[in-house]
Amino acid sequence: MSWIERILGRTSSSSSSSKSKVPEGVWTKCTSCEQVLYSEELKRNMHVCPKCNHHMRFDARTRLLSLLDQDSAQEIAAELEPQDVLKFKDLKKYKDRLTAAQKQTGEKDSFITMYGTLHNMPVVVASFNFEFMGGSMGSVVGAKFVRAAERALADNIPFICFSASGGARMQEALFSLMQMAKTSAILAKMREKGVPFISVLTDPTLGGVSASLAMLGDINIAEPKALIGFAGPRVIEQTVREKLPEGFQRAEFLLEHGAIDMIVQRKDMRDTLARLCAKMTNKPTPFKTAELIVEEA
């Protein structure tokens, strides 16, 4: 080795060792515009891209805790956990899939239910977690949904549910399909008693969830560009052998065709839900809006 190679080799090795390693997870990429984003900034922005306003998928527990007033949340039916009663096996055993999903998410199942206050108004809230087996609906989801609805009925308070699901959980076969009827039945009881149910459809809301509880709200809200439908657009195109309209099954298309009532930005969701709950329960708006301030002036 020549003297210059020795010097260059020493310099390059010392410079590479002095480079500080960037910890994993500090940066992430927008799933729409592919802009590289600082993860902490994205969290502060409620997982909405600050560059293109794309609403990314949002962790269920974080969503509910950010919706409710601080320190007001009480989890409902947290003890319920799915069981592999059918001993189901496809490429993997169902119990192994459950274990992997529980380890990945830190949750027992794909659905979280809570009681708390929203701008000091008591409410029951629930959310699907898409990261847990695609937010699929099984027996535990149905049981927790009913328990949450029963709490809303008992206290005569609004029930708000955020959907993010691929549909019924195939590993539970007919047990999962039964949850469509079970959740629809309790919502019929809520409607009969005049207890408000607000459904918020987020990306994606598909299959048995969209065909049951997700579209049965007294008011159906969607986040921008959420994919909403029964089968996905690719499956429909292959079935009907036709090209679907642009934006088909997206929230904006559904709003234009009267399938949902409104589209709300995530940053506005908390205040919008509070105003709707107040109107639907005949209570004063829990905070002053710009319109009220103008009226009082």
From Swiss-Prot:
InterPro entries reported for this sequence: AcCoA_carboxyl_beta (IPR034733), Acetyl_CoA_COase_Trfase_b_su (IPR000438), ClpP/crotonase-like_dom_sf (IPR029045), COA_CT_N (IPR011762), Znf-ACC (IPR041010)
Residue ranges, annotated region (Disordered): 1-23
Cofactor(s) the protein needs: Zn(2+)
Known catalytic reactions: N(6)-carboxybiotinyl-L-lysyl-[protein] + acetyl-CoA = N(6)-biotinyl-L-lysyl-[protein] + malonyl-CoA
Predominant subcellular localization, coarse grouping: cytoplasm
Binding site for Zn(2+): C30, C33, C49, C52
Domain of life assignment: Bacteria
Pathway assignment: Lipid metabolism; malonyl-CoA biosynthesis; malonyl-CoA from acetyl-CoA: step 1/1
The protein's Enzyme Commission number: 2.1.3.15
Location of this chain's protein in the cell: Cytoplasm
GO molecular function: acetyl-CoA carboxylase activity; ATP binding; carboxyl- or carbamoyltransferase activity; zinc ion binding
Record HAMAP family: AcetylCoA_CT_beta
Function: Component of the acetyl coenzyme A carboxylase (ACC) complex. Biotin carboxylase (BC) catalyzes the carboxylation of biotin on its carrier protein (BCCP) and then the CO(2) group is transferred by the transcarboxylase to acetyl-CoA to form malonyl-CoA.
Record-linked NCBIfam families: accD
Entry protein name: Acetyl-coenzyme A carboxylase carboxyl transferase subunit beta
Organism: Actinobacillus pleuropneumoniae serotype 7 (strain AP76)
Phylogenetic classification of the source organism: Bacteria, Pseudomonadati, Pseudomonadota, Gammaproteobacteria, Pasteurellales
Name of the gene encoding the protein in the UniProt record: accD
